[in-house]
């Protein structure tokens, strides 16, 4: 099957969030399964070296409100050998910011036009156009609208992936997201639980009725995001102080001490709790702040890596000054440091208001940390609560979004932390779970085949 994956960011060319990981790892796994996969993405400033280092780009003209513009499309090799097409327009994309620019509406509408022109002029025509979030949402309507009069586009089926319905880009693109849900042959979300949650007014962001219609037709599917187990492997990870695996779990103690040394934290009698996150309302930082007295009274410490909301940053900075032996904030994102945190913390906190999938809990379990999270979205699908799963458990969950519920879950974790056999069982269970891309990629293939069948196309399986 020929699959074109359109994304605003793709690791290692540009990365802001989890979308870049998915746009790298999922195509790679599909490629390894024998499918003919390509990725197309804007050439942001971080990709300029790769763009200019290789064969000359193909030039094409793309319409814009200001008239036709000349762009370059350079094909480079991405993760695992997957071809990645970098679309360069200096004015729109030759700048550091991937998102958050005042002209994001025009930038990504223009990128979508460039994707269509690339499809029209390329000898390689995909069976599937995999569209991701608001940045590429206009492609669904464009494909449906133009296909009748364009043979190159006629046989392409579309799949629209919702990574986070809360983030829908500029207001003018809200209708495009709605149209993408309506016009795409299939719609996916990044976890089974989130697929159910967005059918409700609470999580549907005004699209719950439309999503219910697609779900009743069998056209909405929740597929859990995977984790690249080659990239995130504590046995080989050069970013952590000491490599370890299931048979050498004592290596985590060395990583915990290295983590404390990095942040100048003294030893403590309780668990070292950590978050690697954007500092936003969604992530439940307010619950952590409200529960900090309970965390500290248990002998615990809190370490946060991430940036975002200024008020949350200021409050964490104040708490760090107030509790110099117990609280640390690194107000930035650092992938290497994040891995050291996964490898060295005892508990990983994810008290999210909602969490479409979440990769943090998957990385934490992969590195032997025990997650404490709210039972929502992908957290509910991946963390096995100690009260429900006994000897097979991997962490601790709570339901209600309030500090009392979170504090109760943390207290359960503290009790387990002081029972070495129980705690080690939780760690080993988490490390033994398989949340790699294999099973998820196979589910995507099923969705692609369903999308083709919905177009009346008999796929060559």
Please identify what each model-predicted range represents:
Residues 1-461:
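Catalytic cores of nucleotide-sugar-dependent glycosyltransferases that transfer UDP/GDP/TDP-activated
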């Amino acid at each position: 099957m020929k699959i074109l994956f359109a994304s605003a960011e793709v690791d290692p060319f540009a990365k802001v969030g989890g979308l870049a990981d998915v746009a790298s790892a999922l195509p790679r796994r599909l490629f390894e399964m024998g499918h003919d996969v390509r990725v197309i993405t804007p050439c942001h400033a971080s990709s300029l070296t790769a763009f200019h280092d290789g064969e000359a780009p193909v030039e094409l003209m793309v319409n814009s409100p200001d008239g036709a513009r000349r762009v370059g499309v350079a094909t480079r090799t991405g993760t695992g050998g997957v071809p990645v097409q970098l679309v360069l327009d200096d004015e729109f994309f030759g700048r550091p910011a991937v998102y958050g620019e005042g002209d994001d509406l025009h930038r990504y509408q223009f990128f979508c036009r460039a994707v269509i022109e690339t499809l029209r002029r390329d000898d390689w025509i995909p069976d599937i156009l995999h569209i991701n979030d608001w940045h590429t949402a206009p492609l669904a309507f464009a494909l449906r609208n133009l296909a009748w009069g364009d043979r190159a586009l006629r046989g392409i089926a579309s799949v629209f992936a919702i990574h986070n319905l809360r983030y829908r880009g500029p207001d003018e693109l809200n209708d495009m997201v709605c149209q993408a849900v309506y016009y795409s042959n299939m719609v996916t979300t990044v976890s089974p639980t989130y697929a159910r949650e967005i059918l409700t007014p609470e999580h549907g962001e005004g699209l719950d009725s439309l999503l219910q219609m697609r779900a009743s037709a069998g056209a909405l599917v929740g597929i859990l995001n995977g984790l690249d187990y080659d990239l995130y492997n504590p046995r080989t990870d050069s970013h952590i102080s000491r490599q370890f695996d299931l048979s050498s779990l004592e290596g985590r103690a060395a990583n915990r001490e290295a983590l404390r040394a990095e942040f100048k934290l003294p030893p403590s009698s309780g668990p070292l709790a950590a978050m690697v996150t954007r500092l936003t309302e969604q992530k439940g930082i307010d619950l952590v702040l409200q529960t900090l007295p309970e965390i500290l009274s248990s002998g615990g410490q809190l370490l946060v890596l991430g940036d975002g909301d200024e008020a949350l940053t200021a409050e964490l900075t104040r708490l760090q000054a107030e509790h110099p032996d117990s609280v640390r904030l690194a107000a930035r994102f650092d992938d290497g440091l994040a891995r050291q945190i996964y490898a060295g913390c005892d508990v990983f906190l994810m008290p999210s208001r909602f969490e479409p999938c979440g990769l943090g809990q998957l990385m934490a379990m992969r590195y032997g940390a025990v997650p404490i999270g709210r039972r929502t979205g992908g957290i509910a699908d991946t963390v096995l609560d100690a009260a429900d799963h006994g000897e097979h458990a991997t962490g601790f969950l709570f339901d209600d979004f309030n500090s009392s519920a979170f504090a109760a879950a943390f207290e359960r974790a503290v009790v387990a932390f002081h029972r070495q056999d129980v705690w080690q069982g939780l760690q080993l269970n988490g490390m033994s779970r398989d949340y790699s891309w294999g099973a998820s990629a196979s589910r995507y293939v099923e969705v692609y085949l369903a999308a083709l069948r919905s177009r009346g196309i008999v796929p060559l399986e």
